[in-house]
Every structure is written in structure tokens, then in C-alpha cells.
């Protein structure tokens, strides 16, 4: 790997790390009743800083998919397809596992007051598949990765932009004709999810599952845009030309998305076409900014914190999910009764010391720091030593 490529990948790791840290922070406030406006999602139409973190990660996944598939020369083979399928299934299964683990812990706690045997309680807690959420963040990542990888190996890359446009335009037509911009159960997205998945297996938000089946269509287009940006990153050698193209793509996509939002609202929960376009544009511009800071100016000492998140992003995200479930379900004595460890830390320590909103933010930051410390330890043990680096040259 040449020097330019190495630096370019460092900037990508940092952006990935920033998004993972952001996802962990906004998903784990001390109290959902006390969240600063920029750290909350838009209720329906609109865009907040928090709405950027997940689509940024999807965008980065598209770039990484291009990089990882180069070893196959983008030619379809049974071995490549098998590896893609295996990775897709594993990521999807991990997402289901997280959903099951959360349901197991909640069910176990809800049965604590009932006079039933240990094994009966255990059995009821384990068997929660009749109302487990099927889709989610990890599942969306899996489906979009699998679809993008197969497209990359079976379609000429010069045709991918046309596929992206077809997916986004087709999805917009679906939204227009299917009441898709309404925030209720008459929305075509809700209708399809209830018919295919069943209401018991959906996220509860006015009938809308933000990671539902139909909204996976524009999400695939989203990752494909990242794939095309990855192609640019790896093929353009001159750093100034690379930055110029990234900023140009980012500016055009952002301007186009906001312009089209007058007829197609920007909406994360339905992953509207304009949401995909705008967030990919902002992601491209942000990546260009990081490359300029890290590669051109050489300011990279600050990035070590985010590198810990960016090198093993899925591991950190899953670990954060498990820790969040444990904090929310481990019971401890508090004020004459019992409460979750999460609630105890916030209500018993941070809220009295700092207040409602600052205490809630402090909890989120401390949780990020906890996950960073684990990620940093993993980075230390997985990074090659200076001696190993010398021997590999």
C-alpha cells in the first residue's frame, strides 16, 4: 500500500470512528426526556445533526465495499458470492441477536414479581421470538451491503449511477402514490411491513419502522453512492484533484437534495430520496475536509480517539448495544425500591450534580468514553508493533 492510500484510509477510519461515536452518544442519553435538540432526531420531516450519523456510516460502508471488492477484480465468482452471503447473514444474525438479548432481559425483569419457577421464568424469557423486532440498524447494514456487493460484481460500474437514479425515482413514485409522506399507519411503508413482518415484529413509531422493508430500497441506493465515491477515492491519485472532486460531488448532491426537498421532503424515518442525496453530499464534503486536515495539513494527532472506534466499528457498536441493555436491566437499590443501573447513575449521581440536560449529556459522554476505552485496548492489541512493521517491509 502506498503512502497516499494509507493516509486516505486513515481519514476514512476517522470518519467511520466519528460516526460510530456519534451513534453511541445519541442512542444513550441519561434520560430521553432531557435531550438537547441537536442530539435528537427530527420528529418527521427535517434534518438534525443526529440524523446524519447513521447515513454517514452507510455512505462509508459503500466506500469500504469498493475497497474490499477490488481483490476480486469486481468479477463474480462462487467463492466471492459465498463470502458476501456469509457476511450478510452474520451481520443480520447479530442484529437479531441484539434484539433478542434486549427482549430477553426485559422479559426476565418483568417476570420477577410473578410466582413462577426459575426454569419457567427462564423459558418464557428465552422464547420471545413471537414479538421480537426483525429489522433494525444491523439488519439494514447487512441487506444494503449484500445488495451493493452483488451489484458491484455483476454490473458494469459505469451503469451504477443509472441504477441509483432508477431506485430513487422509483421509490419516490412509490411514496407519492402510496401515501408515503404521511406519519401514520396508512403509509405504504407501514402497510407492507405489517403485511410481511407483522405488527408484533416492527418498531413502534406511529406505525412506521425506520428500518422497514421498502425504505431499504433507497438505503441500497445510498450505499451505492458511497461505492461510486470509493471508486473515485481509489482511482484518482493526485490529492488535490481528489479533494476537488469530493467537494464538487458533495456540493452538487447537497444542493440538489435541498432543492428537490420542496417536492420531496427530507425524512430519515422513510429514508426519502432527498434524505439519501443530502446526507451523501454532506458525507462526501466531510470526508474531503478530513482528508485535507489529515493528509494535506498533517494534523492527525487529535484523530487517535476516533481511530479506536473506526478500526473495529461493528464490534464497538454491538458491544455498546450489549452494554446499554445490561445497564438498562441490571437492578440496584435506590430510594427505597430498585431501579436500573442506568437510571441510578443518571438520577442518583449525574442529575443531582449537573442538572437535567447536562446530566443526561454527561451520561452519554461517559458511555462513549467507556466504549472508547474498550476499543482502545483492542486497538493496542490488534495493531502491529513497530518491530512487526519493520519486518513486513
Give, region by region, the residue ranges found by the protein language model.
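Functional transmembrane helices that form membrane-embedded active or gating regions
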Residues: 5-14, 19, 243-255, 273, ...
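Transmembrane alpha-helical segments and their boundary/interface "anchor" motifs
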Residues: 51-54, 71-99, 103-148, 152-171, ...
Amino acid at each position: 500500500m502506498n503512502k497516499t492510500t494509507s493516509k486516505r484510509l486513515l481519514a476514512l477510519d476517522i470518519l467511520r470512528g466519528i460516526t460510530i461515536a456519534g451513534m453511541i452518544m445519541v442512542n444513550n442519553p441519561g434520560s430521553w426526556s432531557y435531550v438537547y435538540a441537536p442530539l435528537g432526531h427530527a420528529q418527521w420531516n427535517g434534518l438534525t445533526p443526529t440524523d446524519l450519523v447513521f447515513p454517514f456510516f452507510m455512505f462509508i460502508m459503500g466506500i469500504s465495499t469498493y475497497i474490499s471488492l477490488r481483490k476480486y477484480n469486481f468479477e463474480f465468482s462462487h467463492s466471492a458470492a459465498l463470502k458476501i452471503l456469509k457476511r450478510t447473514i452474520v451481520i443480520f444474525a447479530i442484529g437479531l441477536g441484539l434484539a433478542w438479548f434486549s427482549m430477553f432481559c426485559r422479559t426476565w425483569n418483568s417476570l420477577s414479581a410473578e410466582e413462577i419457577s426459575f426454569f419457567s421464568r427462564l423459558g418464557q424469557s428465552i422464547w420471545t421470538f413471537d414479538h421480537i423486532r426483525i429489522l433494525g440498524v444491523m439488519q439494514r447494514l447487512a441487506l444494503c451491503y449484500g445488495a451493493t456487493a452483488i451489484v458491484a460484481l455483476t454490473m458494469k460500474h459505469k451503469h451504477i449511477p443509472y441504477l441509483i437514479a432508477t431506485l430513487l425515482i422509483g421509490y419516490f413514485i412509490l411514496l407519492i402514490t402510496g401515501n408515503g409522506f404521511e406519519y401514520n399507519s396508512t403509509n405504504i411503508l407501514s402497510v407492507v411491513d405489517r403485511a410481511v413482518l407483522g405488527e408484533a415484529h416492527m418498531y413502534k413509531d406511529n406505525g412506521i419502522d425506520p428500518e422497514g422493508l421498502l425504505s431499504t430500497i433507497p438505503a441500497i441506493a445510498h450505499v451505492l453512492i458511497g461505492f461510486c465515491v470509493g471508486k473515485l477515492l481509489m482511482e484518482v491519485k493526485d490529492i488535490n484533484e481528489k479533494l476537488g472532486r469530493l467537494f464538487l460531488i458533495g456540493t452538487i448532491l447537497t444542493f440538489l437534495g435541498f432543492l428537490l426537498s420542496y417536492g420531496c421532503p427530507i425524512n430519515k424515518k422513510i429514508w426519502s430520496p432527498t434524505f439519501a442525496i443530502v446526507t451523501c453530499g454532506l458525507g462526501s464534503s466531510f470526508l474531503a475536509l478530513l482528508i485535507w486536515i489529515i493528509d494535506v495539513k498533517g494534523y492527525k494527532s487529535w484523530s487517535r480517539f476516533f481511530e479506536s472506534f473506526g478500526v473495529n466499528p461493528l464490534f464497538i457498536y454491538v458491544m455498546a448495544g450489549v452494554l446499554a441493555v445490561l445497564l438498562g436491566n441490571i437492578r440496584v437499590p435506590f430510594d427505597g425500591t430498585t431501579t436500573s443501573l442506568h437510571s441510578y447513575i443518571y438520577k442518583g449521581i449525574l442529575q443531582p450534580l449537573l442538572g437535567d440536560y447536562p446530566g443526561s449529556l454527561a451520561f452519554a459522554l461517559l458511555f462513549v468514553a467507556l466504549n472508547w476505552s474498550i476499543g482502545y485496548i483492542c486497538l493496542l492489541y490488534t495493531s502491529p508493533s513497530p518491530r512487526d512493521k519493520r519486518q513486513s517491509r
